[in-house]
Amino acid sequence: MSRGVNWRSMNTARTGRERWQGVAWIAVSATGFGAMAIFAKIAYQEAVSLTSMLFLRFVIAGLLLAAWGVLLGMRWPRGPDLLWLVAMGALGYVGQSFCYFAALKYASAGLVGLLLYLYPAIVTVLSALLYRRRIGAARGWAVIAALAGTALTVGGDLHSQPLGIALGVTGALIYSIYILAGEKVLPRVGALPAATVVMLSAAAVYGGAVAAAGPALPGSVAGWSAVLAIAIFSTLLAILGFLKGLEKLGATDASTLSTLEPLVTIGLALLVLGETVTGLQLAGGALILAAVIYLARHGAQAVRD
């Protein structure tokens, strides 16, 4: 779920073989991000605490990203840009990830995955309120469709608790603020350096939380497998896959294809966790994804880390 990319920074589309390679990379990325909720549910079943899980996720992924950046000769952010990215990681991404993973304790994986995808609509509204950007009638209807879809999705859910729904919506709101906060700094520093600093900053915060509360590390092969899958497959590989796909497809197509994420979450939740999906949830999810696709293709800004 964390990419650190400004969608507007790349708009070049490719054709032929390179384009299909881009589609494959985005499919890998979406599968990784979409599967994260499933791995988190498994880790909870193995008595891994939320703070320990997120500390391991961020420290493993952050160190591997840093090593990859060193091999590529990555230029590290400095000065005010570095401080801004540290704040984005230590405050924004810590808050968003806490809400998302905490929501999974009280709500179905499929519902939490769909609620996160409210962020393009929220970003559109916040951009209009904070920066006086014109929404326009069509994008306004897309925002309304996303909200209506959310109402249907929540109303059709038979198992989630109100706290889980509230945490899911709060996570989407924090993520939207995080997006707007990074809108200007990310084009200057680049996606990979930004994602690395954000990850390591979040790791430092969760490391402090683990030290204060005491670790609750995985005590089984299943627990460690789930945590490592979150850090490597659902974070590191998902980020790299998105960057490769963005390079080959451009921002608009990459963002549109990334709407596979909640579909992956819902499908895996059904197959692996035995979660049920009602007709109202399917209808609501379809409305949310339709709104997201429209916003992605018509000027919605997004920064994914």
What annotation goes with each model-predicted range?
Residues A43, M53, R57, A103, ...:
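Hydrophobic/aromatic residues within transmembrane alpha-helices
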Residues S52-L63, L91, S97-R132, T170-G171, ...:
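Specific alpha-helical transmembrane segments that line the substrate/conduction pathway
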Residues L65, V86, L126, I135-G155, ...:
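Hydrophobic transmembrane alpha-helices of multi-pass small-molecule transport proteins
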Residues S2, Q21, A40, Q45-G95, ...:
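Transmembrane alpha-helices of multi-pass small-molecule transport proteins
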Residues I38-L50, A102-K105, A151-L163, V210-V227, ...:
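Membrane-interface helix termini and inter-helical loops of multi-pass transporters
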Residues M1-S52, L56, D157-K184, D305:
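Glycine-/small-residue-enriched transmembrane alpha-helix faces in small-molecule transporters
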Residues I26, A30, L56, S97, ...:
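Helix-helix packing/entry segments at the starts of transmembrane helices
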Residues G32-F39, A66-G110, L115-L116, L152, ...:
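Specific transmembrane alpha-helical segments of multi-pass solute transporters/efflux pumps
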